[in-house]
């Protein structure tokens, strides 16, 4: 299996030609091009180098946790959603996937201890978030999982921009954002 990027118009066209649930993009294209839709042996995907998305390994050192007064803990759980995303940070990202990952990384940095709540966000037959690349690939071979910064959380990125926006908005609401502000932030990140 090889991965290619297509623009939004082509994606919508191909998706619009779906005839049955679970039909892959390869099946649709084979049918549209008049090629045999017979079973094709799948080869494990080769990792694609994405220099803008690569992160240096982080060295972790263990430290004794310091007791924190309850008042400070309560203050840290509040997320300032009005200041969550930087327009300059968004503009520096490459494409919708980059902005999607940037927004999720900002959300993780704002509430790292609560971020695991996004694991509850799932589609009818889809898994959007996981704690490993393998879990997303097991759920869908075409998930194109990407790590959210160096958080240890992974997200599927093979959705169209509108679906990415919806997933981001659901993640924001899951972590306490007002739905109206979540929609506004989703549109800012993935207009």
Curated annotation (Swiss-Prot):
Keywords from the named record: Cytoplasm, DNA replication inhibitor, DNA-binding
GO terms under cellular component: cytoplasm
GO MF annotations in UniProt: DNA binding
InterPro entries: Arc_rbn_hlx_hlx (IPR013321), Ribbon_hlx_hlx (IPR010985), SeqA (IPR005621), SeqA_DNA-bd_C (IPR026577), SeqA_DNA-bd_C_sf (IPR036835), SeqA_N (IPR033761)
Key word Cytoplasm present: yes
Region (Interaction with DNA): 96-97
GO biological process: negative regulation of DNA-templated DNA replication initiation; regulation of DNA-templated transcription
Disulfide linkage: none
Compartment annotation: Cytoplasm
Task performed by this protein: Negative regulator of replication initiation, which contributes to regulation of DNA replication and ensures that replication initiation occurs exactly once per chromosome per cell cycle. Binds to pairs of hemimethylated GATC sequences in the oriC region, thus preventing assembly of replication proteins and re-initiation at newly replicated origins. Repression is relieved when the region becomes fully methylated.
UniProt similarity note: Belongs to the SeqA family.
Assembly mode: Homodimer. Polymerizes to form helical filaments.
The name this protein goes by in its record: Negative modulator of initiation of replication
Organism in which the protein naturally occurs: Shewanella amazonensis (strain ATCC BAA-1098 / SB2B)
